[in-house]
């Protein structure tokens, strides 16, 4: 058992009764194109704002999302690591709003961040680093690491902050439920196409059996970017980046946030994104 705890990067008992944690509401309403306008505080919220009426945020196709990204890189000269840092910070901020450390049973709260091989995985690494600064205890599973300086640097940053990396992911959902209070899905983003291959097919199968909440970055992994996937993982929190993708219309979880407050006004106008007005200095906006 001690060897298993060392593998998982946690000094926590596996056996025994399950600790109380945030409940996931079943039967949440299906997401719809979000309307924003005059803002009001959400009842019972923590200072979040919600749109009341006026104009719909645009949900992007895969082609549109790729075109927006390319303009950010080429026309506006944003770098990949710059956008990754802003996106990852947005994700950690949304998570802290929905699952503040004081609402979870452990101190510090334990979070498993699962990162894929592309930019979505990079967002997850940045998110994990900021979660550590926000008072959480993140652990990272990163099975397919690209041999690129950007990703190597992100890993080093996490290691220097004493964020553990798993050599193996627990193969049983019940074990993850016992050890972690939240799972961050940073496996695949909007550029993913084709069939899910190993080891990610098995990972998604395990995630499908969890009872702890899942927070998905931009796209729930395994979903078609435009059509969604009713049989895939069903996150409790979806954090759309830049603008929601069409599959977000199939999201049935409790919380949908928009993150990535970096879109130039001219680019927003060109693609008719109709983004909501972020309040004050916030880097996230609650859509649902």
Curated annotation (Swiss-Prot):
GO cellular component, one term: mitochondrion
Protein name per Swiss-Prot or TrEMBL: NAD(P)H-hydrate epimerase
Enzyme Commission identifier(s): 5.1.99.6
Residues annotated with N6-succinyllysine modification: 144
GO-annotated molecular function: metal ion binding; NAD(P)HX epimerase activity; nucleotide binding
InterPro entries in the cross-refs: YjeF_N_dom, YjeF_N_dom_sf, YJEFN_prot_NAXE-like
Binding annotation for (6S)-NADPHX: 119-123, 189-195, 218
Catalytic reactions on record: (6R)-NADHX = (6S)-NADHX; (6R)-NADPHX = (6S)-NADPHX
Keyword Secreted: yes
Any coiled-coil regions, as ranges: none
PANTHER family: NAD(P)H-HYDRATE EPIMERASE (PTHR13232:SF11)
Broad EC category: isomerase
Purpose: Catalyzes the epimerization of the S- and R-forms of NAD(P)HX, a damaged form of NAD(P)H that is a result of enzymatic or heat-dependent hydration. This is a prerequisite for the S-specific NAD(P)H-hydrate dehydratase to allow the repair of both epimers of NAD(P)HX. Accelerates cholesterol efflux from endothelial cells to high-density lipoprotein (HDL) and thereby regulates angiogenesis.
Residues engaged in binding K(+): 120, 185, 221
One annotated GO biological process: nicotinamide nucleotide metabolic process
PTM remark: Undergoes physiological phosphorylation during sperm capacitation, downstream to PKA activation.
Boundaries of the annotated transit peptide in chain numbering: 1-59
Gene: NAXE
Keywords attached to this entry: Isomerase, Lipid transport, Metal-binding, Mitochondrion, NAD, NADP, Nucleotide-binding, Potassium, Secreted, Transit peptide, Transport
Parts of the chain that traverse the membrane: none
Co-factor: note: Binds 1 potassium ion per subunit.
Organism of provenance: Sus scrofa
